[in-house]
């Protein structure tokens, strides 16, 4: 990623440890703030993306662990019957998030190129590398939620020579489980479980009816929501821009926004802001998995010609994010100090938690996310 640059290089590659720490923290703050997933991070179980910042030490060593607590299955005792000896042990599932290092670097063309530029190399590199890391974290997070291999981009196209499939945590990406993999049948207005993308038709576009049915489905499957103001359960829903456009054109969706919000420019129907419908916070994001980058015949539908989107319905602990330590900032000189380079490195990991659900006869299911295949 060569950049035309200029600046005072008398101290290049000679920063003190304290100065490196400052640049590293500035870089990470900028990357974190630019990442879309940052809005959904939290350190406890009432977070859509639970952020693990410390390693847990046990007999197996230091590991990044996310803990899922299953609901109790017993009914206790009644009256004066003996409770002691009839206690129910809490069932906890400790799931390890594998860690790996992501690195990238910039190098400029040389001192003569510096003289032709007014851009400071160190500052520009920080900005460019921060955006790179933020964007790649977003991509990996949404591929993990969709259960799609890192060998693909979020538009369904192959990455080519990308190293992402070699990330340690890439091996833990799992397809959506049977009862968390749905198709919206737009003709009959029903959700179809254990769905296949080949069954998607052009009529299966997002609608208000889908949102209502999906929330009801999640409640019956005990997908735990996020506690909002007043203790109300909230969920996050994600669509790519074209799927969101189809939802915005649904007459029932339009009618509910018109009647449910204040009229005028503050109405999200006109303002284009984030919409909350029946406890569902609706988000539009370009990295929600879709088929835009696939060749005709390889998309969805019986003939492979239907463009689609894997709409995400997320509750608590939908994703685990291991965020271990500050990034590393390294400056280096090349070619007899004629060229300069900057690299950054961050240790992290993603995991979509799964657990044996007592509500699905003990079958392993995705813990906090439902994928819904829709036409877009």
Curated annotation (Swiss-Prot):
It comes from the Viruses. It is found in: Virion. Its main location: virion. InterPro entries: ORF017-like. GO terms for cellular component: viral capsid. Keywords: Capsid protein, Virion. The keyword Methyltransferase does not apply. The keyword Nuclease does not apply. Transmembrane segments: none annotated. Assembles to form an icosahedral capsid. NCBIfam families: capsid_maj_N4. This is Major capsid protein. The lineage of its organism: Viruses, Duplodnaviria, Heunggongvirae, Uroviricota, Caudoviricetes.
């Amino acid at each position: 990623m060569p950049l035309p640059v200029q600046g005072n290089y008398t101290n290049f590659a000679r920063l003190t440890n304290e100065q490196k720490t400052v640049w590293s923290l500035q870089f990470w703050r900028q990357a974190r703030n630019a990442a879309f997933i940052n809005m959904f991070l939290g350190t406890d179980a009432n977070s859509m993306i639970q952020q693990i910042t410390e390693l847990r030490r046990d007999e197996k060593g230091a590991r990044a662990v996310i803990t899922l607590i299953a609901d109790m299955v017993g009914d206790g005792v009644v009256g004066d019957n003996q409770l002691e000896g009839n206690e129910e042990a809490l069932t906890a599932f400790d799931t390890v998030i594998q860690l790996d290092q992501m690195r990238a670097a910039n190098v400029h063309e040389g001192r003569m190129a510096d003289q032709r530029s007014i851009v400071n190399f160190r500052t520009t590199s920080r900005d460019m590398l921060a955006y790179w890391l933020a964007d790649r974290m977003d991509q990996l997070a949404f591929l993990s939620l969709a259960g799609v291999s890192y060998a693909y981009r979020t538009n369904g196209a192959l990455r080519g020579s990308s190293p992402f499939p070699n990330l340690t945590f890439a091996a833990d990406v799992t397809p959506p489980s049977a009862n968390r993999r749905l198709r919206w049948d737009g003709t009959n207005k029903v959700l179809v479980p254990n769905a296949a993308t080949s069954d998607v038709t052009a009529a299966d576009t997002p609608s208000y009816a889908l949102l209502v049915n999906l929330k009801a489905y999640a409640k019956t499957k005990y997908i735990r929501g996020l506690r909002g103001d007043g203790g109300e359960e909230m969920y996050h829903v994600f669509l790519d821009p074209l799927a969101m456009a189809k939802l915005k054109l649904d007459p029932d969706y339009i009618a509910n926004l018109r009647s449910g919000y204040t009229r005028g420019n503050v109405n999200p129907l006109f303002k284009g802001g984030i919409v909350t419908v029946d406890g569902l916070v609706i988000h539009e994001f370009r990295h929600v998995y879709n088929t835009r980058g696939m060749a005709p015949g390889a998309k969805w539908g019986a003939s492979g010609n239907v463009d689609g989107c894997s709409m995400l319905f997320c509750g608590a602990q939908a994703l685990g994010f291991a965020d271990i330590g500050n990034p590393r900032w390294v400056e280096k000189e090349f070619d007899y100090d004629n060229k300069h380079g900057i690299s950054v490195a961050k240790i992290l990991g993603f995991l979509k938690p799964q657990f044996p659900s007592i509500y699905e006869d003990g079958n392993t299911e995705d813990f906090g996310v439902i994928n819904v295949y829709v036409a877009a």
